[in-house]
Amino acid sequence: MALAHPPLPSLLSHNAQLRPVAIVTGSSQGIGLAIALRLADDGCDVVINDLPPKLRAMEDAVQCIVSKGARAVAVTADVSREDEVKRLVEAAVEKFGKLDIVRLSFSGC
């Protein structure tokens, strides 16, 4: 995927403890995926989130981010349900030790 803008230089990318951690909802495809990839390029570790039927695409997104040198994890959750949002945040903090950014990118009817 070609980026519209080149990646920003990151002084944090070599120290995992200093890297910002971002959750991007709806990030298995489309705009959400583009946001997640850009955050990884800019030095963030990323939690890929979408609904359970999109798990395979989420795992592909994680592999793409890891290939860029960032850390990533896929966590399924329905962000319309408060209990699942809490579980999503808890999973991010458990995996990376903190949470700095939440970017909502999902659609619904």
Where are the regions that the model predicts?
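Short-chain dehydrogenase/reductase
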Residues: 2-97, 101-109
